[in-house]
Amino acid sequence: MPQIRYIVFEGNDLEKLTETWLKEANALVETTPSVLETTLIILPEVLDEFEAYLDFIDMSEFILEEVDLDGVIQIASFHPDYQFDETEPTDVENYTNRSPFPMLHLLREESVNRAIEAYPEIGDIPDNNIDTMNKLGLTRVKQMLDDINRTN
C-alpha cells in the first residue's frame, strides 16, 4: 500500500473540503506511518485566488487546534500563485511553494521531527531551495510549471 495518499477534491464547497481534510488528518492519526505517511489534497476547482487560499489555511490551522490535532498534524501549503512575505510576485523563490493547483499537504508532526533530527542542517533547506530556483532562473522554472500544466 502506498505511503502517500493523493486526493483530488472535486467541487468548490469549502465546508466539504474542510470535512475532507479533517477526515484525512484523522486517517493519518489512526494509520501507521508504514501504511500511510502523508496526504496531498489537490484542489483543481477551488481556492484559486491566493488570498482566499491563505484565509482557508488560517481557518484550517485554527480547526487543528480546536480538534486537538495541533502538534500532531501540520498543513503545508502549495498554490500556483504562492508568494512569500516581502517578495514580488515574479520573484523566483516563490516557486518553491508553487504548484499546478492549490494543495493541502497533511504531514505528521512526528515525521517532521524525525526529519529534523536526521538532517542536521534542516534550516538550510529553504535557502538551498531558493538557490536552486535562482540557478534555474525564472524563465526555466515557469516553463517547467507550464509543461506540467499542459499535461493535466
Predicted segments, located by residue:
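Expand to "…catalyze enediolate/carbanion chemistry for C-C bond making/breaking, isomerization
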Residues: M1-N152
